[in-house]
Amino acid sequence: MNLSPSLLVAASLVLMGCSAQQQDTVAAAPARAPAPQPAPDPAPDPALLFAAPGEPLPPGGQTTVHATGRNAFSLPAANLEDAERTRFVIGNSFFKRNWVQAPASTTARDGLGPHFLARSCGGCHVQDGRAQPPDFHNPLKPQPFAGLLMRLSIPGEGPHGSPVPDPVYGDQFNTEGVLGVKGEGQLRIRYEQVHGRFADGTAYTLEKPVYELAALNYGPLASNLMTSPRIAPQVIGLGLLEHIPESEILANAAAQAALGGPIKGQPNYVWDAYGERMMLGRFGWKANVASIAHQTASAFLGDIGITSKRFPHQTCTPAQKDCLAAPNGNGAEGVEIEDRVLDDVIFYQATLAPPARRNASDPAVRRGEALFHQAQCAQCHRPSYKTGAELFPALSPALSSKGLSGQTIAPYTDLLLHDMGDALADGRPDFKASGRQWRTPPLWGIGLLPDVNNHQRLLHDGRARGVLEAILWHGGEAEAAREQVRQFSAEDREALVKFVESL
């Protein structure tokens, strides 16, 4: 009997939710032969979909690197060719070095601003890792806001269903300005404590951030303004995620719907400047970006103030006269970053390797993996995929590497939107995403955040101070999974965290 991809995924998700005893039974069953892989979108591989706990995969397939420490997120895919490694190094240079205000003698790197959040990509994605919110618990040690941005919009839909920017401050609140240009204002945070208990009586305290846009330099904000804080995530494995066949992601949604439970993931569809069409969203906290190329070019503009061919206009609004009057750093192409440089940065981000798992055979980690499946975490955090063709074949090899195709990977995500409940809701739609929905983030590399970034702040705004706090913030579709974890013993909670941190 021939099974559709949706039914195959549905069956896998049911198996993922079984008890440890049931999972052991599945593991003992004969492995099914992989189905033939048609190009460009291979059908789901039954051997992967029915994989049971206790069978660890290299997170990035042949791209995986064995690394820990400060540089664990900064290494090229292990299977890159020599010429590709040269491009990786060039892209890394432009990702990490600061841009300067124009005009300057360093014409290859001038054009910063007029408004900006950081002077480089690496200013937010430090060591290619995750940013953290400023620590306002210590007023004697102020910290910059680099890495945390505030999206802005008002009700309605713009072109292609995009959010409508605030008429004065645009679609992003930029606190910094170059010499002679005022920053847009200050972003302030305070925290409210949320108390709770596990079923065994152990108390816990969460911290809920409350935001304020203050010291506004261009007049009042719209009275019906909607805001959404977003923290900069780690950027490992992006090219592999981009190579997951769209059919697999849509099969995830179909399978979840077929199960009839509370988990019902939805795809987002967004406008992509490189594809020049509506495409499936894969990146961003609301799956509001379809490609690494679009994300990179739009971040250069929005976060650093650097124009490119597909984003040639600054974000200054009519009310921001000093911003409009500021000089630019345009080069021969009439923009501030040439395509060849931008392509190298895109290639760099596409080929950053996921690091290998640690302690995968530890008994506590294996126990935690069984609990992860028992709590049905794997229904959203789908463990494995087989990558397919690149997203933009016509632009190859400028933006990608052939070594990213045909890889068996373990990112632990379905790349779908889920209603995460009132506590995490921002109330701000983003294309097809509602104000209660967030994309399932990949879990690979999460245990190395303390090594790379000296913290483990998680979720879309960095409010969670570790894995267990992140789980406790889950609501909406994930409420049942959260409540299962609340019922776990202290030993089981520790094992669950150890498993997630081994990824």
Residue ranges and their predicted role:
Residues C18-L503:
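Periplasmic c-type cytochrome electron-transfer domains
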